[in-house]
Amino acid sequence: MSKKISGRVRGISYLLMLVYFASYIMRINFAVMIVKVCSEMQMQKSALAIILTGLTVAYGIGQVLSGIVGDKIKPRTMIIGGLALASVCNIAMFFAHSVILMTVIWTVNGVAHSMLWPPIVRLLSSTLDDECYSYAIVRVSWGSSIATILLYSVCPMLLRVMSWRDIILICAAIGILILFLWVIFSKKLFIHESSTGEAEGNTPANVNSTLPIPKYVFIPMILIMLGIILQGMLRDGVTNWIPSLLSESFGIAEEDAIFASVIPAIFSMVSFYVFDLLHRKVFRNEVFCSAVIFGGSLAFATAMYAVNMMLSSAVLSVLIVAMIIACVHGINLMLISVVPKRFAKSGKVATFSGLFNACTYIGAAVATPVFARIAEVSGWGMTILSWAIIALLGLAVCLGAVPLWKRFRREYSDN
C-alpha cells in the first residue's frame, strides 16, 4: 500500500481481527471435530449434520436481522452481546448429550455469531477510507484463517488426551478473554462513536450523505447473492467434510485427517492478501475478480476429480483442496467484504453486509447435509464433481453481473 497506515488503524484492524478470530473459534470448533464426534456418538455424518445445519440457518437468518439492527444501534454494543452469547452457548454445549439439545444450543450459537460481522463492516466503513479499509478488512479476515489453523492443528493433539466437549469449553474461555479485551480497548479506539454508532473524525466523506440506491442495481445484486450462495456451498461444504474425505478415501486416522486440514487454512490466509492485491492493482472490479476466481475454483475442482479417479494421492488431494478453498475465500473477500462498502452512500452498509453474508450460509446450510448424503450414497468422486459444477455456475452468475455493476460503481459508489 502506498499510504502510511496509522497506529490507530492498525489497532482497529487487529482488535477486530481478534473478534473475528473468537467468532470462528467458537463457531467452527464442532465442525472441525465432527469426525471424532461421529465416532464417539456412533452416528452417521448425515445424522449429526443437522447440528451444523441449525447453526448455519440461524446464522444466515440472523445476519439479515443483525444487519438491519446494526444500522440503528452502536456496533460496539452489538459485538459485546454477540461474543457474550456465543461464549454461553459453547459452555452449554459441554453439558449437552442429546442431538436435539445440541442442535438447539448450536442454533442459538448461530444467532450469536450473526451479531458480529455486520457491525464489524459498519465500523470499518464508517471509520476508514478506501485504502485503510482494504488494509483492515484483510487483517480482519486473517482472524478466520488463524482460528481455523489453530483448531485444525491443535484439536488432533488435544483429542488424544481429552474429550471434544473439553475442547469446546476451552474455546468458550478464549471467547470470554477476547470479550474482555474488546470491552477495554474498543473504548479507546472508537472513542468518538456517536449514539447511532458512527465513528467520527476519520470518517469518509461519502458516509455523511444518504442517497437512494438506483433501481437497476438490484439485478446485479440478485446475481451477486446467487454467487455468494454458491461460494458458501463450496466454502463450508468442502471445508466441513475434508477430514471425512481423507479418512474414508485414504484410510487416514481421524485425528490425522483433521490435522491435514490445516494446509487449506494456511493457503486461505495467504489468499486474502493475494486476491486483495489482484483486485486493487489488476481487476479493479470485485465482481469480475470473483468471476475469475470462480474460474480458478472450477479448474482445481476438475483436477481434483481427475486425481480422485486415477491417482488416488492423499498429498495431491490435500493440495488441490487447499487451492479450491483458497479461491473460495478470495471470492468471499470480494463479495462479502468489498461489495457492501459500495453502498456507503445509502447509509445501510450493515444491512447489506448482513444480507450478503446471510447468502453464504444459505449455501452452507444446503451444502453440509447434501454433500454428506452424496458422499454416503454415490461416493466422493460424485461429490467432487458437484464442486466443479457449483464453481461453473458461480463463474456464470458473476460474469452476468459485471456490466451493471460497472455502471453502478461509475454512477453511484465511485461518483
Where do the language-model regions lie?
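Conserved MFS/SLC helix-loop-helix module at the cytosolic interface between two early adjacent transmembrane helices
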Residues: 61-99
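Helix-to-loop junctions at the C-terminal end of transmembrane segments
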Residues: 63-74, 272-284, 375
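Cytoplasmic membrane-interface "Motif A"-like loop-to-helix N-cap segments
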Residues: 72-82, 280-295
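Cytoplasmic helix-loop-helix junction between adjacent transmembrane helices
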Residues: 105-144
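Helix-loop-helix hairpin linking two adjacent transmembrane segments in secondary transporters
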Residues: 140-190
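C-terminal transmembrane helical hairpin of 12-TM major facilitator-type secondary transporters
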Residues: 286-335
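A late C-terminal transmembrane helix in Major Facilitator Superfamily
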Residues: 343-378
